[in-house]
Amino acid sequence: MLKSAYDSRQYNHIELANGLRILLVQDPNCVKSACSVTFNTGHFNDDKDCHGISHLLEHMLFLGNNEFTEPNAFNDFIATHGGSINALTGTEYSSYFYEIAAEYEQQALTHLYAMLRKPLFCEALIEKEINAIDAEFLLKQKDDLRRLYQVHKETCNPEHPFSQFSVGNHQTFEPFSPFQLKQKLIRIFEHFYQPHNACLCLISNQKLSVSEESVRLLFNHWQSNYKLPIKPLPVLYLERNLGVQINILPLRKTQRMILTFALPEQQTHYRSKPLNVLSHILGDESEGGLLHFYKIRNWATNLSAGGGLEGSTFKDFNVNLQLTNEGIKYTDEVITAFFSYIQLMMESGIEMWRIEEIAALNQLMWDFPDQAKPIDEAYHYSLAMFEYPSQHLIAGDYLLDKPEVQTTLQMLNYFSPKNMRIKVVNPFVKTTHKAKWYDTPYSVAPIESNRLKYFLNGNWRSRFTLPQANKFLPSHRPQKAVEPQFTLPKKILSEDGLDMWYGQDDKFHQPKGDCFLTFDCQAVNEGIYVTTAKRLWVALLNEKLNQKYYQANLAGMHFHFYPHQGGFSLQTNGFSANQLNFCTNLLTEIIVNKDFSSNFSQVKSRQYQGLSNALLNKPINRIFSKLSVLMQQQNHAPSELANVMQNLTLDDIAATREKLLSQFHLEGLIFGDWAAEDAYKISADIKEFRMMFGTCDKIHRGVADIRHNKIISYQVECLHKDPAVVIYFQAPDASLKNIALTILAEQLLAAPFFNQLRTEQQLGYLVGSGYIPYNQHPGIGFYIQSPHHPAEYLIKAIHLFLQQIIENINQYRHLWDTLKKGVMKQLMEKDTNLSMKSQRLWMAIGNQDKTFTYSMQMTQTILDIDFSEITNYLIALVSRQGFGEAILYSPGQHASISYKTEVITDIQSFKSSSQYL
């Protein structure tokens, strides 16, 4: 099996006698085992008279089997042992994947095997789970991506299974009794959930021989009982579905145009990747490229090329454009320019050096990846086994060892107006149809022949050039020797207004690193005006630099400017060879970039649009956003920011920039593959930069103190009919003990809260809890979004649950030690990749954990907590002894709550009168 020379893991691909293909991965560094099983079946195999049945099957597999009869037994087992679990039903594949503490690997496999062998498909639970699926469907009805997807389904070949409604809801299941649905579930399960139609990946720290014995012990008994039904797929698009324009009316304020080209399947070309080559060229943002041309003319602000629907017999190639107000007026010219660029590519040909450059980039990303979490890798590999031969399972996504210039050029023949679908998405289009299920207004019409010809007769070709060679490709250099005194960051420079830290990685041994610089600016204390102008200034700066350093990003050297409560930050990460120079260049860019007139209106419009669209977010997301605003002194609501944003001018940006830079405190961390002398040198450069400006203290991030208030409530405005509620409890203090108790309490309550309020009471699809600290002060949140019940009912349900937990607390005593172990394992979990390690160390510095021992201290604190202490903590929470409580809700179509609370009508008034921790 082909693997990177830098990959220290061991792999073994086996196939059992029953046809089950298994990839075993031995990773000595992983603390959690991860497993994923994927079946070659999805909603394409739904019954024609029962859309969504495969989705229902996915849900039902978790609700009991012959060996573990209790609903959600697998989920509860995983959650209790520090893991997570999920499932996905796609078009042609369905996947089930989880992670768990390594010592429970065998028991988790036993659960998985039982789930896949003999599910119960209990009729009473089928009825309940249909309610959950219907709630899931209703939850997404205002999601523009889902609404757009449904229009796609209605404008393709109606005989192709892609056109079917894949989610399911009450309406699709209603014609059938629970018994009839059970028979349908059994039929699909027996026909498709068979070992010879499945691939499994297990990632573990155990030896490959031990893992192999584990899976063979269980899965050898799984019998293949049915021959897989052969169901040839028709074409995705009929002739009438191509050469068309589809106008779609969105809910959000967006102006997009998507050009879709219908291509054959691409998996046979995985070693030459012709579409990757075309995407690389079409998506280039440098001068001379398509996006640069569109920006100059103020037609578009963003372009992505290459994504799109993909299956075993088809591939869509999408060119996705974010248009400006001006661009909407000139859509035909935008398309004509695109075809001019295609003509340039066809005439110029694809030089071999371009493919070699992409191959070199792929090799770098393969040799030195930011390692994904094992659960994500297991899921990926369980799918890859269907896509690649065994020798290329690991390399398949990166492999470009058989370049085919001619094949790549031939793909351009599919980029013709007659083979194109134009989707125009904006609030001003005229529509004639409404898509089923999501009520998306749309229209579809053939493109007139004179327009088709016009698209090919543009005279823009001379304005374009193909991308230049990438000058940022990192050169190979030996990794720096690790100095033991720097394996944890140390402060190497400290003076008025400046603190610099430096450390070396001794674990991942990659030629990479991360630089963090955070600016705490005195000016943010002036309030929302400076906060909004700062946000726009950072966006304007990013716009300029993204184009200038586009190739650096492609070559694995990234930067991120972003605003935060105290000011703004600059982060660079990726390959270390030229990164420190890159970082100092970006600091210089902060000073020299003062003129933003060329793209001011575009960027401001995009920022305003994004803030305005926040009103359309799901109710539960809106509520959590408002809670964050309510609790944090320096945080402001999107609607308030939007009101300020629309009136900002270039002069305002210039003035705010001067204010922000006039007084600030700068703190930084350089961590990764650099020697101490490199760190001292860049620190001297940063010091020189720092001396040009005034200093100030770090900005205090205040948290509203609601512990001594009555229960407070706030009604959140939302353009969605579902009621939703979040109840937030603020802990008595931010001591290690209270943080530990809060984390443990949330972990203890999470599974029963979900099981009782979602699975049993069917209150909604979005039901859950979470540990929610604000600037290190601990808290717990409980949330429900329901399509069926008013907010007041949901509030009572949460309070009743908490009261009953206290009454029945002893039934959870037997889980206590296991739960504590799970939390401690999470706290001591090893970093998956270098960036994660750098981020953790940087957060520790920000949280004043200067010895980097917080996790160890917290683990010891948790170890010392006994069950009586968590009982007393929960009693105090329910009776609000020392706790604050906030109820935020969106009433949907129902009345406001009549709960006895201290009602907040104006957040700014509340914040101005609040005490802050």
Model-derived features: positions:
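A glycine-rich, aromatic-flanked flexible loop/lid motif
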Residues: 306-313, 505-510, 559-561, 713-725, ...
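Non-catalytic accessory/assembly modules
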Residues: 120-131, 138-139, 144-160, 164, ...
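M16/insulysin-pitrilysin zinc metalloprotease superfamily fold
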Residues: 63-67, 99-132, 313-370, 529, ...
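Buried hydrophobic packing residues in well-ordered domains
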Residues: 19, 37, 55, 96, ...
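M16/MPP (pitrilysin/insulinase) zinc-metallopeptidase core fold and M16-derived inactive scaffolds
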Residues: 29, 34-99, 144, 164-169, ...
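A conserved hydrophobic secondary-structure block that centers on an alpha-helix together
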Residues: 179-195
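C-terminal regions of mature proteins
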Residues: 201-204, 357-506, 623-695, 699-707, ...
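Active-site-adjacent "gating/activation" loops or surface patches in catalytic cores
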Residues: 28, 253-254, 489-519, 532, ...
